[in-house]
Amino acid sequence: MTPESSAALAPPARHTTGLDVLAQRPVFAAVLGALTIAFSGILVKLADVPPATAAVFRCAYALPFLLLLARAERRAYGQRAASQIRWAWIAGIFFAIDLELYHHTIGLVGAGLATVLGNTQVVFVALLAWLLLRERLPLRTALAIPLVLAGVTLISGVIGTGAYGENPQLGVVIGLATGLSYAAFLLILRHGNADLRQPAGPLFDASLSATLVSLAIGWPLGELELVPSWPAHGYLLALALSSQVVGWLLISLSLPRLPAALTSVVLTLQPVGAVLLAMLILGESPNAMQLLGASAILAGLLLATVGRRPAPDTT
């Protein structure tokens, strides 16, 4: 604990937030959170706006709700340390990069497969922690890497014909970059926030940072459409409330309170749900090889996360 955090006044025991009630039902919260986040890519595609525009409003529309929750946390548990706030802002830079890449991937390979590719962050988190933080690389993660790579190859469409997507090969490359940037975001956010009781505060800071960075990214690329339009911004508001607020907070609260093996199943609900929902709602039709590739990646994620509690995903 840093001197700044230890100096914070201990809150009275009677103070609680509405999130504490959900934390007492972690299985329900985790499943609901995973299924909520599964709609993320679908809402981005339905909004049909440029990638940076989707990133800006996804974060900006979430800010008032996150601010209210963050203030409730502060009243209950005290002020977060300045160092924690700085780390959350740095994490927001990588979150903005992740969203920009993810939204491009959706356009190239579809919402379902883009979400599966983004979930390779589970493997990247372990690899980055091993390379940069000198944490032990679990054997299961090492064994999962060939499965994930095989799945990525199949999704790219280089094997067989009739691969779904505008440009599946480029989509795979950008999708892997999505997973890498999201892994960096999660590691930095984890490094700066050891207090699991306060998930909304760091997410507010990271979302505010990501809003500003997304504006900076989108301006030179000509991807900003800042005048609200309907129904696009209805979808973006739904995206902000579902993925950025409700889904993230439910997952953040529940996973640390679940048995490690169960977290693996919960985390795979989101990409599986995204693929199925994209097929049903958007009419996406990955070919057999791409579905096999998605299955290989999901199997790799299960293998990599069994026995540990990986960080949550909100992509």
Regions found by a protein language model. Give the residues of each.
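Hydrophobic transmembrane alpha-helices of multi-pass small-molecule transport proteins
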Residues: 7, 128, 137-160, 182, ...
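Hydrophobic alpha-helical transmembrane segments of multi-pass membrane transport proteins
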Residues: 32-39, 43-46, 69, 89-108, ...
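Cytoplasmic-side transmembrane-helix entry/capping segments in multi-pass membrane proteins
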Residues: 26-30, 83-90, 137-150, 172, ...
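Juxtamembrane helix-entry segments on the extracytoplasmic side of multipass membrane proteins
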Residues: 24-26, 48-56, 79-86, 157-181, ...
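Glycine-/small-residue-enriched transmembrane alpha-helix faces in small-molecule transporters
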Residues: 1-57, 90-93, 101, 150, ...
